Amino acid sequence: MAIVSSNAEPSKGAPRPKPSRVVDAARQLDDSAELSATKEDGLRPRRLDDYIGQRELKQVLGIAIQAAMGRGEALDHVLLYGPPGLGKTTMAMVLAEELGVTCRITSAPALERPRDIVGLLVNLQPKEVLFIDEIHRLTRVAEELLYPAMEDRRLDLTVGKGSTARTRALELPPFTLVGATTRAGALSSPLRDRFGLIQRLEFYGQEDLQAIVMRAAGLLTLQLSPEACAEIARRCRGTPRIANRLLRRVRDVACVREVSGCIDVKLVDEALTLHRVDGKGLDASDRRLLELLLQSHGGGPVGLDTLAAALGEDPTTLEAVVEPYLLQLGFLQRTPRGRVVTAAGRGHLGWPADEGDAA
């Protein structure tokens, strides 16, 4: 049960939350001016049929949507987790579009005080989608407010202090909470267990990424050769968000070079090399870490704190941002003694193999 300041009188309405982004699924299809204001939104698919990849996820959610609409109920609460950039926010907007309702978008760090989340909940319309990004960062008080809201569609509030305190239970309309996180393990068990659908988003394969790049190129009115499309897909780390970002950088170079026809693989290579993205998708930070390990420490093992100090980076940044893709490629290995460059990592940077290398 949460305590709300007695300054917020019930008769004067619910306290106002911090501004949240509201996406009206029906209006979004017709309002091209609003779409062009946000480039990322302009490249997002809006229906499940347009959403490329994540086939198992689409199948599960498609069945859940049809069942909920057939019963005339709100969709069950959904938790989406996985690495950043794979389409969790996009999927929340797609769900709202399929259900024909509004999607209210906010993030956990914006919900600092009880009144922030109370204001959001009491202003929800029936069957609306409430999307909370980085939901693992919710405060304990915010989580406790969500428990009865998710389970019983009820908001339990204690208004006032001391002898004047009184308890109020506010009925909420049926709604769908969609939570997104890159750290599902950081969610408390009571919160995680209240989601009816818990789904992981996986990295995308080459074929799906090529389809995503080709679709985005069409929306940006670019002509890409199949080879150029495949090259961008190879360098985007299996992540649509990065693929779209690289495509825009290619568009910039094509614009400056005044390329009027089809963009070929040579121009793609020129553009991505300019931004120091190599053939495997490694950027300058990735290569700097590997080169430091090889040049200064013979390939490792080296502790995380030592690496961070030498690179001038925060250890958390290295562990959460730089290392995951190197581990995924098999270029880096975490051992009890520290980080080690593998034989594959040596080969990519052109270093000779060493008998002591990790396989």
From Swiss-Prot:
- DNA repair is among the record's keywords: yes
- Ranges for region Disordered: 1-22
Q: Which domain of life is it from?
A: Bacteria
> Where is this chain primarily localised?
cytoplasm
Locations listed in the record: Cytoplasm
UniProt keyword annotations, A-Z: ATP-binding, Cytoplasm, DNA damage, DNA recombination, DNA repair, DNA-binding, Hydrolase, Nucleotide-binding
Which residues bind ATP per the record? L43, R44, G85, K88, T89, T90, R194, Y204, R241
UniProt keyword Transport present? no
CDD domains registered for this protein in UniProt = AAA
UniProt GO BP: DNA recombination; DNA repair
Q: Where is this region: Large ATPase domain (RuvB-L)?
A: 13-204
List every stretch annotated Head domain (RuvB-H): 279-359
Q: Name one GO cellular component term.
A: cytoplasm
Q: Which catalytic reaction applies to this protein?
A: ATP + H2O = ADP + phosphate + H(+)
List the GO molecular function terms: ATP binding; ATP hydrolysis activity; four-way junction DNA binding; four-way junction helicase activity
Name the enzyme group at the top EC level.
hydrolase
Matches recorded under HAMAP family: DNA_HJ_migration_RuvB (MF_00016)
Entry similarity comment: Belongs to the RuvB family.
Under the subunit heading, UniProt states:
Homohexamer. Forms an RuvA(8)-RuvB(12)-Holliday junction (HJ) complex. HJ DNA is sandwiched between 2 RuvA tetramers; dsDNA enters through RuvA and exits via RuvB. An RuvB hexamer assembles on each DNA strand where it exits the tetramer. Each RuvB hexamer is contacted by two RuvA subunits (via domain III) on 2 adjacent RuvB subunits; this complex drives branch migration. In the full resolvosome a probable DNA-RuvA(4)-RuvB(12)-RuvC(2) complex forms which resolves the HJ.
- What the record says about its domains? Has 3 domains, the large (RuvB-L) and small ATPase (RuvB-S) domains and the C-terminal head (RuvB-H) domain. The head domain binds DNA, while the ATPase domains jointly bind ATP, ADP or are empty depending on the state of the subunit in the translocation cycle. During a single DNA translocation step the structure of each domain remains the same, but their relative positions change.
Summarizing the function annotation, the protein's role is: The RuvA-RuvB-RuvC complex processes Holliday junction (HJ) DNA during genetic recombination and DNA repair, while the RuvA-RuvB complex plays an important role in the rescue of blocked DNA replication forks via replication fork reversal (RFR). RuvA specifically binds to HJ cruciform DNA, conferring on it an open structure. The RuvB hexamer acts as an ATP-dependent pump, pulling dsDNA into and through the RuvAB complex. RuvB forms 2 homohexamers on either side of HJ DNA bound by 1 or 2 RuvA tetramers; 4 subunits per hexamer contact DNA at a time.
- Give the protein name, as stated in the record: Holliday junction branch migration complex subunit RuvB
Taxonomic lineage is:
Bacteria, Bacillati, Cyanobacteriota, Cyanophyceae, Synechococcales
Q: Which gene encodes it?
A: ruvB
